[in-house]
Amino acid sequence: SCSCQKHFSCCD
């Protein structure tokens, strides 16, 4: 449940 964030690989 992650939005487009550059913290993790959520925003591929």
UniProtKB/Swiss-Prot annotation:
Residues carrying Aspartic acid 1-amide: 12
Cystine pairings recorded for this chain: 2-10, 4-11
Subcellular localization, as worded in the UniProt entry: Secreted
Tissue distribution: Expressed by the venom duct.
Transmembrane residue ranges: none
UniProt keyword list: Amidation, Disulfide bond, Secreted
Broad class of the protein's primary localization: secreted
Cellular component annotations (GO), alphabetically ordered: extracellular region
Free-text comment on this protein's domains from its UniProt entry: The cysteine framework is XVI (C-C-CC).
Protein name as catalogued: Conotoxin pc16c
The organism of origin for this protein: Conus pictus (Cone snail)
